[in-house]
Amino acid sequence: MESPAFFFSLFVWCLLLSITAYSLYVGFGPPSKQLRDPFEEHED
């Protein structure tokens, strides 16, 4: 368990998890009210 590959893979896994959590927060959390909807802006 002391190999550098284990710690590197753990770091990459935590990085991907945090990016995913932040994306979900921005997409569905309180900041989503500030996002624009291009389909709603373009009325035919």
UniProtKB/Swiss-Prot annotation:
Stated family: Belongs to the PsbN family.
Protein name: Protein PsbN
Transmembrane segments: 6-26
HAMAP family in UniProt: PSII_PsbN (MF_00293)
Annotated membrane topology: Single-pass membrane protein
Superkingdom of origin organism: Eukaryota
Subcellular location per the Swiss-Prot or TrEMBL entry: Plastid, Chloroplast thylakoid membrane
Xref: PANTHER family: PROTEIN PSBN
GO cellular component: chloroplast thylakoid membrane
